[in-house]
Amino acid sequence: EIPILHCALFFFMRNYAYSGMFRYSSKGDFNVPYGGIAYNSKLLNKKLAYYKSKELLSHFKKTKIYNLDFEQFLRTVKPKENDFIFLDPPYDSEFSTYAQNAFTRDDQKRLANYMINECKAKWMMIIKNTDFIYGLYDKEGINIRTFDKEYVVSFMNRNDKKVTHLLITNY
């Protein structure tokens, strides 16, 4: 019962935390405020009904959830040529720590190396443009496009509201 309760609490927090954020304090405590008055109109029952629908439950029966380092995961599932992978890794910024686990530049290098040199599947990545990230993926056979994104939320001015992103593919 406890894992089910944890799943339910996680679902609730993701849906009702401010701007869908999920972060922890340096002490390991969840520290995102409630979403505010606009969230009062969110219909939790409607969302729960969708998650109980036959179509989605059928899909979930074929779904496996992993909690692994990305490289362990990819080496476990061994994506093939007819697979497609969408990647949304943490940004190359000072604020890239989730649940007290940093995603470092070494992790960014490992990810780029695996995706460019070992991954047989087609893949697409969206990530904030930095010189470091651009340099990792500016390789033959890799396509890089840019697009601008304006965020509504920027906590304590840690993140720029206007950001250029990279859309990176191997096809």
Spans of features found by a protein language model:
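Long, positively charged, glycine-interspersed low-complexity recognition regions
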Residues: 92, 104-171
